[in-house]
């Protein structure tokens, strides 16, 4: 969660004391922990048979409980223009399957408003993914800011709803959904251009490609051997007579092999490859 833009930044419309209070409400360690545990922000949510429908609000209830009196007191005191709005520019979800591709099933993922009893998709922000299509990335963009209010006994805010369909015979986890978003809070609101929900199918990760390439150890050995070979053909640092072609050919001539254990071999240890751990 973050505040962006001077016209939408609540901290510039209230006193420093209220700004500190707001920072504590939104960014304290406890608030961040609640965002993860209650809303699954940035965490993997497993879709199981015993949890076929998942409703995840984008704001924890404890945060809403703290924000409502903050906005109300500022509004009643004439410091704020409204009782507060929640704005979410975009919600991104990464979806992967955890069963075989031939499993018959699908996921319906959409953005809803908890102020709606039916929890219908807002502005057509709904995507259906069949099991064989996964993995995939999906995105949602609401067209309005949600008022921070109570509807009955429910705190109104946006929520990500995931429905699991099919997967007969699969009682365990069939898919994993990891959602990320950035909630903003302001005393001003707006409407936004409609954008259809996005669905991008992702190619599965080809981990076999890593094994088809030379390993790091093999590349290191190869580079060392190349350095050894090149060092044995370096010309000595002496002046050469351009007209003495016969003398040059003798210098460039490769020396005969040196027997292991001979005195000459000990003087040429610089040409031997180093030992790499693990080989």
UniProtKB/Swiss-Prot annotation:
Biased composition of type Low complexity is found at 256-266
**Has the keyword Transport been applied to this entry?**
yes
Quick one: signal sequence residues?
Answer: none
Fetch the InterPro entries from UniProt: MPV
Annotated region described as Disordered, given as residue ranges = 256-279
Keywords of the record, alphabetical order, are:
Host cell junction, Transport, Viral movement protein
Coiled-coil ranges (or none): none
Biased composition, class Polar residues, residue ranges: 267-279
The subcellular localization recorded is: Host cell junction, Host plasmodesma
Q: What is its main location?
A: host cell
Q: Which GO terms describe its biological process?
A: transport of virus in host, cell to cell
Pfam entry (one): 3A
Gene Ontology annotations for the cellular component aspect, listed alphabetically: host cell plasmodesma
Family in the record: Belongs to the cucumovirus movement protein family.
* Function, as annotated: Transports viral genome to neighboring plant cells directly through plasmosdesmata, without any budding. The movement protein allows efficient cell to cell propagation, by bypassing the host cell wall barrier. Acts by forming a tubular structure at the host plasmodesmata, enlarging it enough to allow free passage of virion capsids.
Q: What is this protein called?
A: Movement protein
Q: Which organism is it from?
A: Cucumber mosaic virus (strain Q) (CMV)
Cite the source lineage: Viruses, Riboviria, Orthornavirae, Kitrinoviricota, Alsuviricetes
